[in-house]
């Protein structure tokens, strides 16, 4: 009788062990959701145009040029396409795609584009507003991101108020139409030769030619 209890106990231990192994395998079969706060925008890198109409001479897009100057452009351009990358929760870096320069800010508030990333000068806090606009502020200096103004270039930066920017989606590589290339036509399902394997290829895309 004692032998029977011992055997039953051993069998129960093996059943529990096998059940634990099975449940562990099922758990590992499912991907663990990434709860990193750096992915709050669906990805660490966003491609955007930063547009502002706050307290500027004209409506403008933030533009980083290859010589390192930062200006406001009335229209979108390759120089105004930016990459916004999360560094930590609420803090980002801004890179001009064409110029390959990081947006940075001096202690006096002046903006410039640097070929090298300086965590102190090139890190910005990003505050999301309810109206869809964002406010950016230097993490090190606490000064708001603001495009240079022609009428008051020497204005005291400490008197600047927050400027709203509207992040407008942009593509790193805009699709371009290829001249002289026609997309392939769908097969004619009503034909006895829907894939044109027998009939001569007349007026079809060159991609169908052998």
From Swiss-Prot:
Q: What SMART domains does this protein map onto?
A: FGF
Q: Recorded GO terms, molecular function? A: fibroblast growth factor receptor binding; growth factor activity
Q: Where does the entry say this protein is expressed, by tissue?
A: Most abundantly expressed in the liver, also expressed in the thymus at lower levels. Expressed in skeletal muscle (at protein level). Secreted in plasma (at protein level).
Gene that produces this protein: Fgf21
What is this protein's record name? Answer: Fibroblast growth factor 21
Q: What does this protein do?
A: Stimulates glucose uptake in differentiated adipocytes via the induction of glucose transporter SLC2A1/GLUT1 expression (but not SLC2A4/GLUT4 expression). Activity probably requires the presence of KLB. Regulates systemic glucose homeostasis and insulin sensitivity.
Presence of keyword Secreted:
yes
Which keywords label this protein? Growth factor, Secreted, Signal
Keyword Signal part of the UniProt annotation: yes
Cleaved signal peptide residues: 1-28
Q: Where in the cell is it found?
A: Secreted
Q: How does it assemble?
A: Interacts (via C-terminus) with KLB; this interaction is direct. Interacts with FGFR4.
């Amino acid at each position: 009788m004692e032998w029977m209890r011992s055997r039953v106990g051993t069998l129960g231990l093996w059943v529990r062990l096998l059940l634990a192994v099975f449940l562990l395998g099922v758990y590992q079969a499912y991907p663990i959701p990434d709860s990193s706060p750096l992915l709050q925008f669906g990805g660490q890198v966003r491609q955007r145009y930063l547009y502002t109409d706050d307290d500027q001479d004209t409506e403008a897009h933030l533009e980083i040029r290859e010589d390192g100057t930062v200006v406001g452009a009335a229209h979108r351009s390759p120089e105004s396409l930016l990459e916004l990358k999360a560094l930590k929760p609420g803090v980002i870096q801004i890179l001009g795609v064409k110029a390959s320069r990081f947006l940075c800010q001096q202690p006096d508030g002046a903006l410039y584009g640097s070929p090298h990333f300086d965590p102190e000068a090139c890190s910005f806090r990003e505050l999301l507003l309810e109206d869809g606009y964002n406010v950016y502020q230097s993490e090190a200096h606490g000064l708001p991101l603001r495009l240079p103004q022609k009428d008051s270039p020497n204005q005291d930066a400490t008197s600047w108020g927050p400027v709203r920017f509207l992040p407008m989606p942009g593509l790193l590589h805009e699709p371009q139409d290829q001249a002289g290339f026609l997309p392939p036509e769908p097969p004619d399902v009503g034909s006895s030769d829907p894939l044109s394997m027998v009939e001569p290829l007349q007026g079809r895309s060159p991609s169908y030619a052998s």
